[in-house]
Amino acid sequence: MSETIFEPTDHPHRRYNPLIDQWVLVSPHRAKRPWQGQQEKVSEEQKPTHDPNCYLCPRNKRITGEPNPDYHQPYVFKNDFSALLEDTPAPEQSADPLFQMSQARGESRVICFSPDHSKTLPLLTALEIEEVIKVWQEQLRELGQKYQWVQIFENKGAAMGCSNPHPHGQIWANSFLPNEVAREDVSQRNYYEKHGSVLLVDYVQKELEKKERIVVETEHWVAVVPYWAVWPFETLLLPKVHVKRLTELTDAQAKDLAVILKKLATKYDNLFETSFPYSMGFHAAPFNGEDNEHWQLHAHFYPPLLRSATVRKFMVGYEMLGESQRDLTAEQAAERLRALSEVHYKER
């Protein structure tokens, strides 16, 4: 009786994520299963450059009644429904190990990427994205003086819970290290102490050599579908050399970041020729007074779409109770994204 040879594109297997010390189940044989479940609504109506009913457009009133300025560049303001407050008092300490609280202070801000209501990141020019990056850097410098963690992120599309269609991101600063970041901190620190090198710097060099998971590459940056990806078309955006924070980028690296953000976001939109939903955000060294040499700047992109513009992946059942699972292999997803044009389908 002949022994079956393992084939990663056919056989179930687990892949290890060294960044958060967790495993993901890969089930490539399920990729062709029929789908009769929920489908997302797709709206391709042409948005105006200015919507008089939008709370975020220039000159309009926000939901609080406060007017927006007639802004022409990226615009930052305090979130009208902040998840964190600056003056939160500390709770009383509990002696009961099962009922613990800790103080949570912080600030929540919104950044409108541009005054144009119709232009998401891939539809902005690289120069316009550079302006967004400059604002990110300014916010990090300011908030990093008061808080140990500053989270820059974007929820794009209604499928990701975005409550306003005007292209915007958020900036949350807090007095504590969030769970996901704390896991990354421990893993990167342990790797650095064991190997004397930076985990994600070593990882990016190996991905550059292997090439099979690369989606987009520029002079200073590379976007890959990580070996351990959970979401179908998840990507990890990395600088090619050691950089701890966005504020430490050279001018050339910052300009090139704008280029690769536009290219990556364009490929996402081109995949199903729709405004591709995702949650994305940057992780970088905390502002905790340590040297943090073990940290490497990176950005996660978590898009939910799986088979088409209307079929998304759900994190339910086994994934909530056991561990994350995916059907497409990371290599298959990267191949599909890599083959797509870097010219947006609306601009051809």
Write out the residue ranges for each language-model feature:
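Extended C-terminal subregions enriched in glycine
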Residues: 256-275, 279
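A contiguous, surface-exposed recognition patch within enzymatic or periplasmic domains that forms
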Residues: 244-253, 257-262
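Acidic/histidine-rich, metal-coordinating catalytic segments
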Residues: 280-284
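Active-site microenvironments that recognize anionic phosphate/pyrophosphate groups
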Residues: 1-166, 172-244, 252, 266, ...
